From Swiss-Prot:
InterPro entries per UniProt: Ribosomal_bL27, Ribosomal_bL27_CS
GO molecular function, one term: structural constituent of ribosome
Compartmental location: Plastid, Chloroplast
GO biological process entries: translation
Pfam families, alphabetized: Ribosomal_L27 (PF01016)
Protein name in the entry: Large ribosomal subunit protein bL27c
Family statement drawn from the similarity comment of this UniProt entry: Belongs to the bacterial ribosomal protein bL27 family.
Keyword hit for Iron: no
GO cellular component, one term: cytosolic large ribosomal subunit
Superkingdom: Eukaryota
Length: 74
């Protein structure tokens, strides 16, 4: 018999809210493993590296020195 036949459940990672879309305070924007995206203005990091908004506004992605940042503006 084979030793294959197993598969893990998907972890539903990725970007949940894209650029210029509205987000509410506490809203999850990105689920990730490690800090692929770093927190910018009005964004905090959860213990599993989830990025979430700390205030209402619109999502903005930017790259600074080859690092990707996510901010909430206006």
């Amino acid at each position: 018999s084979t030793k294959n036949g197993r598969d893990s459940n998907s972890k539903r990672l990725g970007v949940k809210v894209y650029g210029n879309q509205p987000v509410k305070a506490g809203g999850i924007m990105i689920r990730q493993r490690g800090l692929t995206f770093k927190p910018g203005i009005s964004v905090s990091v959860g213990k599993d590296y989830t990025l979430f908004a700390t205030q209402n506004g619109y999502v903005q992605f930017e790259t600074i020195n080859d690092k990707k940042f996510v901010s909430v503006v206006g």
